[in-house]
Amino acid sequence: PSNSEGIKLRSYPTIDGLRASELTLNAVKVDQKDILGALHQAMPAIQQVVDRACVLLCAEAAGAMDTAVKLTVDYIKNREQFGQAIGSFQVLQHRAVEMLGAKDFSRALTYRAAGAIDQSNSSERAKVEMGRSGKLIGQEGIQLHGGMGMTDDMPIGHFFKRLTMIDAIFGNVDFHRKRFAQII
């Protein structure tokens, strides 16, 4: 039970407006009837669940990236500066295309990971690319929105925060890159 001696749960808000918890176990005694499997044999089952959860997070991130790109493209098409839409400037068009390419590549790897869920490296590749693409799309989205992108009034900031949190859950880019390197 969660109120057993040695279990400490600390809840806290995350940057994306949700909540998370930190669970600390210290010399927790478990009754024999509560043991789910053989001693020291749980890691493969836990890893399988985490791999599947990573693919689901990548799917959520794909949707967030899609919306972030659409919001940004719409903003630069409609925001006028110097008497014309800022989206008419070629350098901003190139940045928007980079965002689109990153989003599409990440989505493709997510689809591949979902289709090959039991292959040992499919979730790592998707999670690495999702983290890289999410960071690029979030940062570019904020930049292309200008100072307004940092305010709570513009939804792009929320998507950047959510993409940042998704990257951190179940291991960030660096964690999954190292794990992928060990597999291959």
Per-region residue spans from a language model:
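FAD-binding core of flavoproteins
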Residues: 1-66, 70
